Amino acid sequence: MELPLFAILQRTPRVAITLAFVLFVLTIVPALYTLLADPILPPSISSFETDHTRLSHLNSSSNQIPSPVNGSIPTPPYHTPSKHRKSSFHRIPKPKKGPISSPTDHIPLRQRSSSFDQIPSPMNSPVPAPPHRNSSADQSPSPVNGPIPAPLNHTSLRHLNSSSDDHSSPVTTSPSRTRIRDDEQMCDLFTGEWVPNEEAPYYTNTTCWAIHEHQNCMKYGRPDTGFMRWRWKPESCDLPIFDPQEFLEMVRGKAMGFVGDSISRNQVQSLLCLLSRVEYPEDISPSPDTDFKVWNYTSYNFTLHVMWSPFLVKATKPDPKSNFFSLYLDEYDTKWTSQLDQLDYLVISSGHWFSRPVIFYENQQISGCQYCALPNTTELPLTYGYRKALRISLKAIIENFKGLAFLRSFSPQHFEGGAWNEGGDCVRTQPYRRNETIPEADLKVHDIQREEFRAAEEDGMKKSGLRLKLMDTTQAMLLRPDGHPGRYGHLQNPNVTLRNDCIHWCLPGPIDTLNDILLQMMKTDN
């Protein structure tokens, strides 16, 4: 008689126990083996151990990461953790291959293609407190190469649609992620707004040797740093931040010249500072004359010429008995025009010196004067001399230059509360908004530049195929009353009255943007 299996097990307990043990072994042992071979841990613990293991490995290699303060692992503020990870610990990005060598005391070059390579902010170091100074408004730095030029026919700012205190900041886009595409070459670079840029500045007064004393605002105690943290944002595109390696590759084996006054030299100092993150130049100037300098970047065989010509045309300094400059409005200043055949790029600018007392000569005869009050001499306006001088200078470029030329427009001054010699100062700490306008005299000089440029551009294309471009930066710089040295271009001395400098620009500062625009225009031309 056959019995069911459960009946057999009831009668023979030992068989039941043995069978149960076999089933237990066959079920549990494989599971234990899987668990021991590949443990399943909570995601946060797994992520922590992965990052911790990587950090331990890096610390044991030759490329050690400096130990963080208090033994904590810093979270890079610029790194966004992977959306697939649930850990709060951020991976440290791998270094890029082939970093650009830079001077050891300089900020390394920022690779704009990645959001990882943000330049450390030099503003983490304490800003020196301004020394004790007289509160008088008529202090100012000693100007470069002579007295600060007399003001243009300055009028107060005309407020169109808002007050000057409206400094609301628009939403900013990281300059490291935006570039002007090929199909945006016709973008108007010169109409736009200043937007915050927390990545700036890209050099400091301690890392760049080229900053002139009178533009070294932080050295002389300027208490605010916000003026360094803006970038120019055109309306219909984004302007890339200046890339020094890209610039040097573009000008490899070539020569560039800057012609003009101390604002032109101010821009050159900015360019030298921006390029110093890649290479220091060698001074190969043929003479000790500081008005004519030549630097060479040996790794790129690039030469940079700076030529002092504040009037652009032939001029003679006043004799001891006179305060009048003599301007020969129909004669070239051969100190720079004779160098044109050696250059591939040219940046020409001027304006401020034309507000000085001058006597005009044409055809070797006195044709008039400005601010002279001489008997039997026609008093002529500023616009007369400037138009004539700019016209003949552009003619010299058309006839003697075969490269790419830029006419940089007038850089405005921002005296408030009086003229340069009447206690005027520039104490604003934020940019103007675009709906605030400019002094009328600045508009006159700017209008002349635009008119003469159009005529020269047409003439140059007909005669020689000259590539002449207008770098119309007046609006951008007009909106930056906060960018001047003011009283912070010299030591503060309560016993000495010095005038404020509201003409030149602090370095680093807004004038760095001129080189952003210069590089972009060079790229567009190519």
From Swiss-Prot:
Gene Ontology molecular functions: O-acetyltransferase activity
Annotated motif GDS motif, positions: 260-262
Keyword Membrane found: yes
Superkingdom to which the source organism belongs: Eukaryota
GO (cellular component) term, any one: membrane
One Pfam family in the UniProt entry: PC-Esterase
Keywords of the record: Membrane, Signal-anchor, Transmembrane, Transmembrane helix
Region (Disordered): 57-183
Keyword Cell membrane: no
Membrane topology: Single-pass type II membrane protein
Polar residues: bias regions: 57-73, 133-143, 153-163
Regions that span the bilayer: 15-35
Record-stated family: Belongs to the PC-esterase family. TBL subfamily.
Known function: May act as a bridging protein that binds pectin and other cell wall polysaccharides. Probably involved in maintaining esterification of pectins. May be involved in the specific O-acetylation of cell wall polymers.
PANTHER family per the UniProt record, alphabetical: PROTEIN TRICHOME BIREFRINGENCE-LIKE 21 (PTHR32285:SF351), PROTEIN TRICHOME BIREFRINGENCE-LIKE 9-RELATED (PTHR32285)
Protein name: Protein trichome birefringence-like 21
Species in which this protein is naturally found: Arabidopsis thaliana (Mouse-ear cress)
Gene that produces this protein: TBL21
